[in-house]
């Protein structure tokens, strides 16, 4: 261990006052050897900014060693956060997919461990989580695999915040990248920079391309960052269809010196941001060019899969009535180059970022895999490690839910809280800071900035007053939730009814889901007719997950009045089958019959059934596995209940868990799937039934018992 827990200057990091928090700059010997001067400059800047920073150098043998050190600093040195610089071990988490927003991949052999695990620094910043070590990767030896332990808390509540500064080795200058970044991060701490310029972009495919879903962000961001709305160029909102070439516009935007924050809502992979589809043709020549391009692309894809391209060409000629000349050049290298450029115009790639040298200080990537730091390089890292003034990238290490709120408590940034302090409140398993987690914008003079470390319930109740900004009130409600404040359910309901602030009311919705006292169901009924589309969308979705009988009629009413809001209508379709005996369809048919304003009822129903039919078909197939022991597709339907936890099948699913005639693998999977019933209206009874079974003395396989213990913990977190 080299210089662990000490600084490399004459100033010792052990002199930490009780009111002054510390910050660990964690690295390994090679990075320290090449970047020691820059690490020290960064440390000094962090100290000047208000934290007692220290450099921690070690040849880390495994993540547990580092985690134990961080725990010690947290107990003894008031550790606030840490940044991992260089080649610091990566914890690859398994058996914890419920802590992600969307990631679901078979962990039992169908996929490699590398792909079916989640790279996550929650291993380092949430000390209450418990893990069982699995193994070390034999080829990428900095990867260490862990299962979330059955006895662990089944939710995330970070004790500290973390970030990563991880360079690309393949680009040839990893230590230079680190050194240059540390110097610019240090320099940035000496200036004033309020958050008063932002850009938001929604890419093709985000929110089903629904303008009803897109438009409300102008309201929510104004609630959270009002200073950005005080000038003509302070807040800009783009959507993929605005201009023919959005890529050029966005590259110019992120290069603006005054830009503080950009939010990307898009699809992504580690090396690319998907911005748009191929632009719509504007004339006959454009349609001709576009058609040939698409056919060439399909043929190349088919060739890559080993398919018969000659047979496929003949099929296209017959199907579309086109001449063979349209297809003769599909494998011409000249057209391959041209087509690659055509495709490149639809996204931002790593090299585009390098050439642009972004100056936007913070970029939030509400996208899949843009923050996947297990790879040599990723979009979020490349933004901050390029030559511009970019300092922080917030990205996800795996895929992420499209219908996820990505701006909860985001107003904390405008009030001077650091990127790490904000993310500590909203982290999920896959979300990460790439860059300096201590970076913060300059707070407005006189801004309210409560002490995040207070555990005084009365202190936080004070900040629920309407005179405070919406995200300070939202933060206070979250702190009261963490402290298990008495009467919080009623306070959340009161705030929900009295506030007209979208983001504060959304926070009430998030937190009230954990109470099983009837208030949440009332909120969902109100929320299904809310002016904020996201609240309508999620209320619709959760009405099905709760699954009380009266909610079937409420969902039918939602569809009838809001079917033109594409994401709302889609969410009705997702959950319309979460009721027994086709209850939703019966209510829908009745409401349609009573709707005098619908001129052509047959056409209306036909279009609606296109939204409902798939869900109804899957539910029907699922039901058969409980009545027919030899039903086909049993594993498919059981696995599908992770996305579709049908309330009507909760107790039958537990019966399968108890059935000794079923295989251990199937019983274990059923036990795990029950953990997705966190909003089920009968979850208290479900918890009681699980507890009775666990305590009955009945013999059961260890795998089944472990999964039931985990499921019970998951359900209890939503049953205050």
Enumerate the language-model features and the residues they cover.
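Bacterial Sec-dependent N-terminal signal peptides
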Residues: 1-18
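Loop/turn elements at helix/coil->beta-strand transitions in domains of secreted/extracellular proteins
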Residues: 19-23, 48-53, 77-81, 192-198, ...
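Structured catalytic cores of large enzymes
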Residues: 64-244, 253-261, 270, 276-283
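Catalytic cores of nucleophile-dependent amide-cleaving enzymes
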Residues: 117-180, 289-405
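Caspase-like cysteine protease fold
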Residues: 406-494, 498-510
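Amphipathic alpha-helical scaffolding segments comprising HEAT/armadillo-like alpha-solenoid repeats
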Residues: 453-464, 485-497, 517-528, 548-560, ...
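Short inter-helical turns and helix N-cap capping residues of alpha-solenoid HEAT/ARM repeat scaffolds
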Residues: 468-469, 500-501, 531-532, 562-565, ...
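Structural detector for internal amphipathic alpha-helices that build alpha-solenoid repeat scaffolds
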Residues: 471-483, 503-515, 536-548, 567-582, ...
């Amino acid at each position: 261990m080299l210089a662990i827990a000490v600084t490399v200057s004459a100033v010792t990091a052990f002199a930490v006052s009780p009111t002054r928090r510390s910050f660990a700059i964690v690295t390994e010997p090679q990075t320290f050897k090449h970047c020691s001067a820059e690490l020290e400059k960064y440390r000094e800047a962090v100290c000047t900014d208000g934290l007692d920073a220290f450099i921690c150098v070690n040849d880390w043998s495994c993540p547990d060693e580092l985690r134990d050190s961080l725990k010690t600093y947290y107990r003894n040195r008031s550790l606030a956060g840490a940044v991992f610089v260089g080649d610091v071990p990566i914890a690859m988490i398994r058996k914890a997919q419920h802590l992600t927003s969307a990631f679901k991949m078979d962990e039992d052999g169908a996929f490699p461990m590398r792909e079916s695990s989640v790279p996550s620094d929650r291993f380092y910043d949430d000390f209450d989580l418990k893990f069982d070590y699995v193994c070390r990767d034999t080829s990428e030896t900095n990867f260490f695999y862990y299962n979330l332990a059955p006895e662990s808390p089944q939710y995330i509540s970070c004790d500290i915040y973390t970030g990563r500064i991880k360079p690309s080795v393949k680009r040839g200058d990893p230590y230079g990248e680190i050194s240059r970044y540390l110097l610019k991060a240090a320099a940035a701490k000496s200036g004033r920079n309020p958050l008063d310029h932002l850009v938001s972009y929604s890419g093709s495919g985000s929110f089903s391309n629904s303008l009803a879903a897109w438009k409300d962000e102008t309201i929510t961001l104004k609630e959270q960052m009002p200073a950005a709305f005080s000038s003509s160029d302070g807040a800009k909102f783009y959507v993929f269809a605005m201009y023919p070439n959005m890529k050029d516009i966005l590259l110019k935007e992120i290069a603006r010196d005054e830009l503080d924050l950009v939010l990307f809502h898009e699809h992504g992979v580690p090396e690319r941001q998907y911005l748009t589809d191929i632009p719509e043709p504007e004339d006959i020549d454009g349609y001709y060019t576009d058609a040939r391009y698409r056919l060439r692309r399909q043929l190349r894809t088919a060739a890559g899969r080993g398919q018969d391209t000659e047979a496929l060409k003949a099929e296209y000629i017959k199907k579309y009535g086109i001449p063979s000349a349209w297809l003769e050049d599909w494998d011409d290298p000249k057209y391959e180059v041209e087509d690659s450029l055509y495709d490149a115009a639809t996204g931002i790639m790593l090299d585009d970022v390098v050439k642009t040298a972004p100056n936007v200080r913070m970029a939030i990537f509400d996208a899949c895999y843009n923050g996947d730091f297990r790879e040599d390089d990723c979009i979020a890292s490349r933004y901050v490690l390029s030559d511009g003034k970019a300092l922080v990238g917030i990205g996800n290490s795996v895929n992420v839910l499209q219908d996820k709120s990505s701006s909860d408590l985001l107003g904390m940034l405008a009030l001077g809280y650091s990127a790490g302090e904000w993310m500590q409140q909203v982290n999920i398993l896959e979300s990460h800071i790439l860059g300096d987690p201590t970076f913060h914008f300059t707070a407005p003079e006189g801004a309210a900035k409560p002490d995040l470390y207070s555990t005084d319930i009365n202190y936080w109740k004070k900040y629920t007053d309407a005179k405070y900004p919406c995200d300070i009130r939202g933060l206070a409600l979250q702190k009261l939730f963490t402290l298990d404040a008495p009467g919080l359910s009623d306070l959340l309901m009161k705030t929900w009814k009295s506030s007209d602030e979208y983001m504060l009311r959304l926070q009430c919705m998030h937190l009230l889901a954990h109470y099983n006292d009837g208030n949440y169901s009332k909120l969902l009924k109100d929320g299904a007719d809310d002016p904020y589309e996201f609240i309508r969308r999620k209320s619709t979705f959760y009405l099905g997950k709760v699954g009380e009988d009266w909610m079937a009629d409420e969902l039918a009413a939602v569809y009838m009045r809001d079917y033109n809001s594409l994401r709302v209508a889609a969410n009705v379709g997702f959950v319309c089958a979460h009721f027994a005996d086709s209850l939703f369809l019966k209510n829908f048919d009745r409401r349609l019959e009573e709707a005098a304003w619908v001129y052509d009822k047959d056409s209306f129903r036909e279009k609606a059934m296109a939204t409902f039919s798939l869900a109804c078909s899957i539910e029907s197939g699922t039901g058969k596995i409980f009545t027919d022991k030899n039903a086909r597709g049993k594993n498919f339907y059981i696995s599908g209940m992770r996305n579709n936890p049908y309330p009507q099948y909760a107790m039958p699913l537990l019966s399968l868990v108890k059935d000794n005639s079923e295989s251990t693998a199937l019983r274990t999977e059923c036990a795990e799937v029950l953990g997705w019933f966190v909003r089920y209206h009968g979850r208290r009874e479900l918890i009681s039934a699980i507890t009775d079974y666990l305590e009955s003395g009945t013999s059961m396989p260890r795998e089944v018992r472990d999964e039931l213990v985990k499921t019970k913990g998951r359900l209890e977190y939503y049953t205050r």
